[in-house]
Amino acid sequence: MVAPTLTARLYSLLFRRTSTFALTIVVGALFFERAFDQGADAIYEHINEGKLWKHIKHKYENKE
């Protein structure tokens, strides 16, 4: 008997039934959105280092 390949196991676990297929797509979209958003924020902050308020607010805060 031949061992099932990775793609065959993925198909049988995640994509065979419509309900698990839809759930897989939704969960994948949520993780992708989170990763993309954090990556875009990191790139934006790197490009604008020293120009954003959170980087320069210590210069303008009153110290009492």
Curated annotation (Swiss-Prot):
Component of the ubiquinol-cytochrome c oxidoreductase (cytochrome b-c1 complex, complex III, CIII), a multisubunit enzyme composed of 11 subunits. The complex is composed of 3 respiratory subunits cytochrome b, cytochrome c1 and Rieske protein UQCRFS1, 2 core protein subunits UQCRC1/QCR1 and UQCRC2/QCR2, and 6 low-molecular weight protein subunits UQCRH/QCR6, UQCRB/QCR7, UQCRQ/QCR8, UQCR10/QCR9, UQCR11/QCR10 and subunit 9, the cleavage product of Rieske protein UQCRFS1. This is Cytochrome b-c1 complex subunit 9. SUPFAM superfamilies: Subunit X (non-heme 7 kDa protein) of cytochrome bc1 complex (Ubiquinol-cytochrome c reductase). Belongs to the UQCR10/QCR9 family. Keywords: Electron transport, Membrane, Mitochondrion, Mitochondrion inner membrane, Respiratory chain, Transmembrane, Transmembrane helix, Transport. It comes from the Eukaryota. Component of the ubiquinol-cytochrome c oxidoreductase, a multisubunit transmembrane complex that is part of the mitochondrial electron transport chain which drives oxidative phosphorylation. It is found in: Mitochondrion inner membrane. Residues 48-64 are mitochondrial intermembrane. The chain crosses the membrane at residues 22-47. Residues 2-21 are mitochondrial matrix. The keyword rRNA-binding does not apply. GO terms for biological process: mitochondrial electron transport, ubiquinol to cytochrome c. Coiled coil: none annotated. Gene3D superfamilies: Cytochrome b-c1 complex subunit 9.
